[in-house]
UniProtKB/Swiss-Prot annotation:
InterPro entries: DAO, FAD-dep_OxRdtase. This is D-amino-acid oxidase 3. It comes from Cryptococcus neoformans var. grubii serotype A (strain H99 / ATCC 208821 / CBS 10515 / FGSC 9487) (Filobasidiella neoformans var. grubii). Pfam families: DAO. Disruption phenotype: Decreases growth on D-glutamate and D-methionine nitrogen sources. Decreases growth in presence of D-glutamate. Glycans are attached at N180. Induction: Expression increases when grown on D-asparagine, D-methionine or D-proline as nitrogen source.
Length: 373
């Protein structure tokens, strides 16, 4: 049996990005998830439902570092595989003076500037523009998975009830290191059970429209979770994601028709060309492809990205572990937690993967482990 250095729990964008990072470092890894990258219609994980665009809302240096690193990697991806990642113009519009606060990333993105009055259409009075990146998220997930499989990294479907099981899965054998990228699963996974993890429901509308630019509504008076945005997807299909909403602690995956209608109305106001009639139609003329719901994996304190040393085995957890988790009398192991990123999963993914890679390096050095090349 192949000997693995680590098992990654979670096959969303974080789990797959981390697996790629560790593979590039020469580690033998495997990915295990309830849902696989091909399950693009599953509401069991958030990754397939994202827009996604790079629009950082980092509030501290660690978050800024992750987002900026990912931005730089997206630049490379956009040149190499443009149908996955594309650089395009962004426009953020608002009505009242002072609504926009100058962002930290104004010198990271391309061509940041305030719009002239004649460049802003009614009912808006102010705006800002710059260029950044958007992803075709379903294709990007499949790309990450394909890259891993080409490197002979297994991506397996398994439903684990406890963290301890991951250290001795029948298909993979015994490992001493697990990466916990379980997203919302971190709330219920035995051995983690983080009560501060919760969902933030997002609802979007996938449409087909002749729009190539991203748009966002800046409205300090908007209802919580109700801020319109428009994200064209790279590729030849002409697909555009319209959003959005952000409803904390809402576990429902049902589409709310009233929310969908409000999204279409607000987005048509942001960019009338969505109607396919040069802006001369109404929101009802927008060509709707599908209505979508995803549950963002949020954590009250933000991302948890840290190493935890654990002891597993019959002497420690005989009352909790499943049979697969009982692997001897008190074996010392490690786990790197990487969950709770909320709505910033894609725009921080590669920066988080880099950080996890550094934590793994430190853990292996401390534990006198060598990669199983």
């Amino acid at each position: 049996m192949v000997k693995y250095d680590a098992v990654i729990l979670g096959s969303g964008v974080l789990g797959l990005s981390i697996a790629n990072e560790l593979t590039l470092k020469g580690l033998k890894v495997a990915v295990v998830g309830n849902d696989l990258p091909e399950d693009l219609d599953s509401t069991g994980f958030a990754s397939p439902w994202a827009g996604a665009n790079w629009h950082s809302f980092a509030i501290n240096e660690a978050e800024r570092r992750r987002d900026q690193y990912t931005f730089e990697q997206f630049a490379r991806l956009a040149k190499e595989i443009p149908h996955l990642c594309e650089r395009r113009a962004y426009y953020y519009l608002w009505k009242g003076e002072g609504a926009w606060k100058e962002p930290w990333y104004k010198d990271v993105v391309f061509g940041y500037r305030m719009l002239k009055p004649e460049e802003v259409h009614a009912p808006f009075k102010y705006g800002v523009t710059y260029e950044a990146y958007t992803l075709n998220t379903p294709l990007y997930l499949l790309h990450l998975a394909s890259t891993l499989r080409s490197a002979r990294v297994p991506i397996l479907r398994a439903r684990l009830s406890s963290l301890d099981e991951a250290y001795s899965l029948p298909q993979l054998g015994s490992v001493d290191l697990v990466i916990n990228a379980t997203g919302l699963g971190a709330r219920s996974l035995l051995g983690v059970e983080d009560p501060t993890v919760y969902p933030a429901k997002g609802q979007t509308v996938l449409v087909r429209a002749p729009v190539k630019e991203c748009y966002g509504l800046v409205d300090p008076l908007a209802q919580p979770g109700q801020k319109a945005y428009i994200i064209p997807r790279p590729g030849p299909d002409g697909y555009v994601i319209l959003g959005g909403c952000y409803f904390p602690n809402d576990w429902s995956t049902n589409v709310n028709p009233e929310v969908a209608e409000e999204i279409l109305k607000q987005c048509h106001t942001l960019c009338p060309r969505l109607d396919g009639k040069g802006g001369k139609g109404t929101w009802k003329d927008i060509e709707v492809i599908s209505h979508n719901v995803g549950l963002r994996p949020v954590r009250e304190a933000g991302l948890r990205c840290e190493v935890e040393e654990r002891v597993i085995g019959e002497k420690v957890n005989a009352g909790l572990a499943t049979k697969g988790g009982k692997v001897g009398g008190g074996r010392k192991v490690g786990v790197v937690h990487a969950y709770g990123i909320g709505p910033a999963g894609y725009q921080a993914s590669l920066g988080i993967a880099k950080e996890v890679g550094e934590l793994v390096d430190g853990w292996m050095k401390k534990s006198n482990k060598k990669a199983k090349l």
